[in-house]
């Protein structure tokens, strides 16, 4: 079967107990193209925003992976598991649980630039082997702490009864942040253990649940309805400044050549990421870079 010539961004509201790769397979089948990727995996137990990249949009993956993401999570106190979430085996338990005030007192120390030790049950690799493959063999290795940024961490609910004590948190964080590790570390800081009981991604970059469609709804649609859901590739970069080029300079940019700012009348700071437009619309991402003859904008990814 020949791939359809179709491109765009699809926001799926991923349900529980399916993998991100399952969603890639579904989109390949429904959109009739093998060119499908995503902009950041969700574990099977997690739900919410999964940014699917169809056709030429798959080229945007590396850039979208860097975007800030927002999650809603439930932290259950009193137990620790080998996976740091509720799907794992309990490896420690505690008869004590924190009060709401005690939890609120430690949260500020988990905001901003922090370090996390990645969990063994993760897709990170050591000597070509994924850590979760080693973990399933009962092997644990030392992992270096990695810097991540927690931009926002807010307590939205706290409840305690005879069965459990749980807290609902909203977290906005950088690439590479493990929410289950955050839950685990908060529990350890409070001296009572903690594990992630639920996780829902509500925002990834510019995309929210308002843009999302469920897999079941997607299956019910006809081809035209599904195609109409696809967002333009440029929507992923709506927060970047746009530079519109006349045909002469657009031809240079299409060839990957730098264009000096003094020649097109722009004064963007070095390091600025930009969107390139020609008479047909968005066609590339670029960056402002220094050159001997002055500052220039350089195409770095053509779409």
Can you annotate each of these PLM segments?
Residues 1-15, 21-38, 42, 46, ...:
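Accessory RNA 3′-end/elbow-binding domains used by RNA modification enzymes
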Residues 1-211, 285-286:
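RNA pseudouridine synthases
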């Amino acid at each position: 079967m020949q791939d359809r010539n179709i491109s765009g961004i699809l926001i799926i509201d991923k349900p529980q107990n399916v993998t991100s790769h399952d969603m890639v397979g579904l989109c390949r089948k429904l959109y009739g193209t093998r060119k499908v990727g995503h902009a950041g995996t969700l574990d099977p137990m997690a739900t919410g925003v999964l940014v699917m990249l169809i056709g030429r949009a798959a080229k945007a993956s590396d850039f979208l992976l860097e975007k800030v993401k927002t999650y809603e999570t439930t932290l259950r106190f009193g137990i620790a598991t080998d996976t740091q979430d509720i799907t794992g085996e309990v490896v420690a338990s505690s008869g004590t649980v924190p009060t709401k005030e005690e939890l609120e007192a430690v949260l500020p120390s988990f905001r901003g630039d922090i370090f996390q030790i990645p969990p063994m049950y993760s897709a990170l690799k050591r000597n070509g082997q994924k850590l979760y493959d080693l973990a399933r063999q009962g092997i644990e290795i030392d992992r270096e702490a990695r810097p991540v940024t927690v931009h926002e961490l807010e307590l939205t609910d706290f409840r305690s009864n005879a069965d459990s004590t749980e807290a609902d948190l909203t977290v906005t964080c950088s690439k590479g942040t493990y929410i289950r590790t955050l839950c685990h570390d908060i529990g350890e800081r409070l001296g009572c253990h903690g594990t992630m009981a639920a996780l829902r991604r509500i925002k990834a970059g510019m995309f929210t649940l308002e843009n999302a469609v469920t897999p079941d709804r997607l299956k019910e649609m006809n081809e035209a309805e599904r195609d109409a859901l696809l967002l333009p590739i440029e929507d992923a970069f709506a927060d970047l400044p746009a530079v519109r080029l006349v045909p002469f300079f657009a031809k240079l940019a299409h060839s990957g050549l730098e264009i000096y700012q003094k020649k097109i009348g722009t004064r963007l700071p070095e390091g600025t990421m930009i969107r390139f437009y020609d008479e047909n619309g968005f066609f590339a991402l670029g960056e402002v870079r220094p050159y001997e003859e002055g500052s220039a904008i350089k195409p770095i990814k053509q779409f």
